[in-house]
C-alpha cells in the first residue's frame, strides 16, 4: 500500500485538509462531540471532511442529514457519505479519529499525523489488564499523533495548528514506528502466500508419508 501511495500523483494545495473519520462504537465522535469539534475547527482556513463510518450512514441517516443541514452554510466543511472513492483519506494532511482502525492504514501509509479523541475505548476483553501488556492501540496514540479528551474541544484549533506545523517531525517519527513494529513491510503478501503454500505442502507430504507406511 505504501508503494501505491508513493506512486500516486499528489495534489498540491495552499489549504490544509483535515479528515475526520470516526469509528462505529458507543460514544464515538459523531455521537459525542462532533458538533462541538466542528464548531471550534471551522473558520480557521482548513478544508474539513467528515467521513462517517459506513454503518453510521446505513443505520442513522437522520443524523447524517442533520449534520449536512447544520453545516450547509459552512463552505469549509463537507459531510461525505459517498464511499466510492478513498482519495480524501490519502489526500488529507492529517486525520482526526477516536478508536477507528483507519488510523493505522492512514498513518502507516502516508506517515501523516493523527489527532485522537479519547472517547470510551471499545473493550473486547474486560480483563485485558491482567495480561500485564498495554495494548498497542493505547500507547501508540501519542507516537503517531496527539490526543484530546471529548471535553477539550475548545483546544482543537491550537492542537491542530501545532500538529500541522510539525508534520515533518511526525513523518520521521511515524516512519521509524512503522519500521520497528510492522513486519515484512512492503512484501507481507508474498510472505503470507509463501507461508500458506508451504503449510499446505507439508500437510500433503505428511499425509502421503502416513499412507505409505
Report the location of each language-model feature.
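Short, conserved catalytic or adaptor-binding loops enriched in Gly and charged residues
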Residues: 11, 66-73, 135-143
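Conserved catalytic-core segment of nucleotide-activated headgroup transferases in glycan assembly
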Residues: 1-67, 150-153, 164, 184, ...
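A generic local structural motif
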Residues: 3-7, 34-36, 80-84, 102, ...
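Hydrophobic/aromatic beta-strand patches that form the interior of the parallel beta-sheet core
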Residues: 49, 78, 94-96, 115, ...
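Catalytic binding pocket for nucleotide-activated donors in carbohydrate/polymer assembly enzymes
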Residues: 101-180
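Donor nucleotide-activated moiety binding/catalytic core segment of transferases
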Residues: 60-104, 109
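C-terminal alpha-helical cap of glycosyltransferases
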Residues: 185-213
Amino acid at each position: 500500500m505504501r508503494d501505491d501511495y508513493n506512486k500516486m500523483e499528489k495534489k498540491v494545495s495552499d489549504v490544509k485538509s483535515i479528515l475526520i473519520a470516526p469509528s462505529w462504537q458507543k460514544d464515538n465522535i459523531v455521537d459525542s462531540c462532533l458538533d462541538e469539534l466542528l464548531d471550534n475547527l471551522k473558520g480557521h482556513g482548513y478544508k474539513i471532511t467528515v467521513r462517517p463510518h459506513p454503518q453510521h450512514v446505513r443505520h442513522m441517516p437522520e443524523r447524517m442529514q442533520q449534520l449536512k443541514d447544520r453545516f450547509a452554510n459552512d463552505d469549509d466543511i463537507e459531510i461525505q457519505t459517498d464511499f466510492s472513492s478513498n482519495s480524501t483519506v490519502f489526500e488529507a494532511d492529517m486525520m482526526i479519529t477516536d478508536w477507528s482502525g483507519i488510523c493505522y492504514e492512514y498513518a502507516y501509509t502516508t506517515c501523516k499525523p493523527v489527532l485522537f479523541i479519547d472517547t470510551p475505548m471499545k473493550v473486547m476483553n474486560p480483563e485485558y489488564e491482567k495480561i500485564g501488556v498495554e495494548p498497542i492501540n493505547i500507547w501508540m496514540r501519542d507516537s503517531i499523533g496527539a490526543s484530546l479528551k471529548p471535553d477539550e474541544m475548545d483546544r482543537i484549533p491550537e492542537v491542530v495548528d501545532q500538529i500541522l506545523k510539525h508534520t515533518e517531525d511526525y513523518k520521521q517519527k511515524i516512519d521509524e514506528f512503522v519500521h520497528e513494529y510492522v513486519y515484512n513491510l512492503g512484501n507481507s503478501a508474498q510472505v503470507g502466500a509463501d507461508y500458506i503454500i508451504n503449510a499446505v505442502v507439508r500437510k500433503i507430504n505428511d499425509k502421503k508419508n502416513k499412507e505409505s507406511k
